[in-house]
Amino acid sequence: MAITIVSVRARQIFDSRGNPTVEADVKLSDGYLARAAVPSGASTGIYEALELRDGGSDYLGKGVSKAVENVNIIIGPALVGKDPTDQVGIDNFMVQQLDGTVNEWGWCKQKLGANAILAVSLAVCKAGAHVKGIPLYEHIANLAGNKNLVLPVPAFNVINGGSHAGNKLAMQEFMILPVGASSFKEAMKMGAEVYHHLKSVIKKKYGQDATNVGDEGGFAPNIQENKEGLELLKTAIAKAGYTGKVVIGMDVAASEFYGSDQTYDLNFKEENNNGSQKISGEALKDLYKSFVAEYPIVSIEDPFDQDDWAHYAKLTSEIGEKVQIVGDDLLVTNPKRVEKAIKEKACNALLLKVNQIGSVTESIEAVKMSKRAGWGVMASHRSGETEDTFIADLSVGLATGQIKTGAPCRSERLAKYNQLLRIEEELGSEAVYAGANFRKPVEPY
């Protein structure tokens, strides 16, 4: 007898910020239960698929009872009897038939909510791996047609600014990437050591309260100069003895400080802001170039506003060989926007966030498209996370070569890194760590 889905149930749980989110249980005819939860972001791109929230006063408008109900009443009953290994069939059925809403960028999940559909999509994927009797990462690799499993380079977000932190820093994330490690295990060691050195450097310079952590486990010292953030990382890396082995990445999240006057305000968090730090896209581009000249920066994410395609293309053509230019808000993991960016040479790497697009199948499509264009791919958490570890397996199965899921601090972040340690151990001598090849760990599949 083929194993089929016997029930799909959802519930409201809480993410790492104390906001409601959706968890789904997929039960199979052999008694197996697959469970998955979805995350949510703070700095969200306007082109992301719809995250359905209840509004009203309960949970300050952030309840997800409608999304939960959509799983329990619409999606669940419709999936009973289906084969959990048919990921594409189930995803397309949910997205195109049960939901069916479309905007100019494709299937937008406005009826059922991307959070409802994704919770089920992730749980179905876990169920499919169980039925096949293989690890989740292997099942994902098979779904994508990828033959090479790769452990990603972790990008640890160790200094927080932007919408993630209460300091004056405009740029959202300052990350460290242990590209010189020989294994994921060693990368974790390097990351953790640099993190602790950074903590003592910050404590000494700014005092104990500067070592309080932000949503993703990074520090949020009250600094205003973005360059100061880079300087702190450079110092911590040197103190840990990893100069040349640990490099730097940034997530600017520039859409958060782009104004209607088409300028970028590096002082956007100041209450008595006189506009003295507003700069043009051209000036911001030159600022990045000066950073890259002075610091070992290998990756810059969302350097411009999500609609500022022109400056993206300029920056990519000027420094894209040396530095990865990552589209997050620009692309929102949407295959149609990825296609446009490839055509316009707007960036050269995809940030993969499953909850921006809302299904496993569409996520795989965006990754394959990016890899065929010669781009890099970085799998990513969201700032509001759960203990779910799906993205760890996803990054190995799709050989993304990179993952960012916070600092080596806070259990909802470590859950993913710890899962990657387990996967590396399970693969044994077969384990390959992306290392210096993080931008292109495998040939396109």
Curated annotation (Swiss-Prot):
- The domain of life for this entry's organism is Eukaryota
Q: List the keywords (alphabetical).
A: Allergen, Cytoplasm, Glycolysis, Lyase, Magnesium, Metal-binding
Catalytic residues as annotated in Swiss-Prot or TrEMBL: 216 (proton donor), 353 (proton acceptor)
The residues that hold substrate are 164, 173, 301, 328, 380-383, 404
The cofactor named in the record is: Mg(2+)
Recorded GO molecular functions are: magnesium ion binding; phosphopyruvate hydratase activity
User: Would the keyword Magnesium turn up in this protein's UniProt record?
Assistant: yes
Q: What is its main location?
A: cytoplasm
Main enzyme class: lyase
Q: Where does Mg(2+) bind?
A: 251, 301, 328
Q: What is its EC number?
A: 4.2.1.11
Gene3D superfamilies from the xrefs?
A: Enolase-like C-terminal domain (3.20.20.120), Enolase-like, N-terminal domain (3.30.390.10)
Q: Where in the cell is it found?
A: Cytoplasm
Q: Name one GO biological process term.
A: glycolytic process
Q: What is this protein called?
A: Enolase 1
What species was this sequence derived from? Hevea brasiliensis
